[in-house]
Curated annotation (Swiss-Prot):
The active site is at 126 (proton acceptor). SUPFAM superfamilies: Protein kinase-like (PK-like). The keyword Kinase applies. This is EKC/KEOPS complex subunit BUD32.
């Protein structure tokens, strides 16, 4: 296993076919509290991954877990961020498949995935194009901030943060492509407009 990422919340290890996500101990927290929080968050993340697998929403296949580790499938592909920015494509085995897809195709597919999640009351919590991987199809990854909610407020915040990510890292036009795959109903649209207005006031 090779350590590929070490963040504030977890360490990520990989082998050829597997990813292990290991939640890290926070020294500033009381041991009992730290253990309880890590177990709870690991359990919630596992539950969401298993739910996505059951719904056939493209995501890593869950393998096993213990108190602090999640073992899951390694999605072999390219971050969508790189594809949309035309980075690191020339030597990749997926180049021919990617070239057959337009940026609009990719964003529509992402819209379909996020819509399916929200339709099942799953909030991702960290929607960026780095958290979508293109292999044989687009997969969504990284559910450390994910949770369940049927509230339009939570879904609208998820969408708004992704809009901001698309505009800041890529192209404002990509937002409209995304919404070609994610159909916003009237009540959610009303809440999304409120969230955007609040966001503009803070900027």
């Amino acid at each position: 296993m090779i350590l590929i990422t070490s963040g504030a919340e977890a360490e990520i290890y990989e082998s050829e076919n597997m990813i292990i996500k290991r939640r890290v101990k926070k020294n500033y927290r009381i041991d009992e509290l730290d253990s309880m929080l890590n177990k709870t968050r690991t359990k919630r993340e596992v539950n969401i991954i298993k739910k996505l697998n059951a719904l056939n929403i493209p995501s890593p296949m869950f393998y096993t877990t213990n108190k602090y580790d999640i073992v899951m499938e390694k999605i072999k592909g390219i971050p969508v961020k790189n594809i949309l920015n035309n980075e690191s494509l020339t030597s990749n085995q997926f180049l021919n498949k990617i070239c057959a897809k337009t940026h609009k195709d990719i964003l529509i597919e992402i819209g379909n995935i996020v819509y399916a999640m929200h339709n099942n009351n799953i909030i991702h919590g960290d929607l960026t194009t780095l958290n979508f991987i293109y292999s044989d199809k687009i997969h969504i990854i990284d559910f450390g901030l994910s949770f369940y909610s049927n509230k339009d407020e939570d879904k609208a915040v998820d969408l708004y943060l992704f809009e901001k990510s698309l505009i800041s890292v890529h192209n404002e036009e990509f937002v409209s492509y995304f919404y070609s795959g994610y159909i916003v109903n009237e009540t959610l649209n009303k809440k999304l407009l409120e969230i955007r207005k609040r966001g503009r006031k803070r900027e």
